[in-house]
Amino acid sequence: MRLLLLASACALGTAALAQGTPGAHFIENWDMDGDGLITVAEIAEKRGEIFVMFDQNEDGALDAAEYDLFDETRRADIEANAGGRKGPMALVDQAMDRTFNDADGDGLVSLDEFGAQAPAFFDMLDKNGDGVISSADFKPGG
């Protein structure tokens, strides 16, 4: 059920918005308060929601099978709705990858490990260093 909700949420992108605004699909999905700006707190909140969606056995860790499904779903969404894994979207994909999030290298990604990477993920995308992620961070040279 959670995966169906994630797939539905990912598919709800506004096509016209996505075509005209750099990073629109990402902003639409990660801007939790709808102000067009993403804070580190919103990144942390969304990462927590994503973790819960893919922790199918609810044991507090993403195992190899759960992370494989997460990788497949995320990459399909990026390809279909965000112009593919290039530019800033390559950074999004990298920051959600298992190797980025498995801090202790045990093959499992705990909620604590996943959540602890929120600030690093934010810093990767806040290219202009203004303390928020906006469409400006997705423009060439952002």
PLM regions with names:
Residues 3, 17-142:
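Calcium-binding acidic motifs and repeat modules
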Residues 1-9:
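Sec-dependent signal peptide recognition
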Residues 13-15:
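N-terminal signal peptide c-region/cleavage motif recognized by signal peptidases
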